[in-house]
From Swiss-Prot:
It comes from Picrophilus torridus (strain ATCC 700027 / DSM 9790 / JCM 10055 / NBRC 100828 / KAW 2/3). Seems to be required for maximal rate of protein biosynthesis. Enhances ribosome dissociation into subunits and stabilizes the binding of the initiator Met-tRNA(I) to 40 S ribosomal subunits. SMART domains: eIF1a (SM00652). Residues 10-84 form the S1-like domain. Belongs to the eIF-1A family. The gene is eif1a. This is Translation initiation factor 1A.
Amino acid sequence: MDNDNDENTIRVITPNKKSGEIYGIVEKMSGASRLIVMCEDGVTRNCRIPGKMKKRMWIREGDLVIVKPWEFQDEKGDIIYRYTKTQAAYLSRNHMLPEIIDVFNEKQ
């Protein structure tokens, strides 16, 4: 059952556009599980890290994340997922990131 394509395949989670999830880059840590995130729609949001992610996944400045904006306050949101550097580079190489947040683009 060897498949040569499995070695080179990287599977990454993408935002669910139907539920309003978008890409974002963490700009600043605000403390108390809060972050300032620049989102792909050009809005800077004050996002929080949900309790189930706090201890499991550490988030730093410059990380690529998936944000779900709040329905009742558009300037706030929740962090859904954090990409590793390898996953972020993969998304950038395959042009899956919007230009506004593609800071992983390697100039060649």
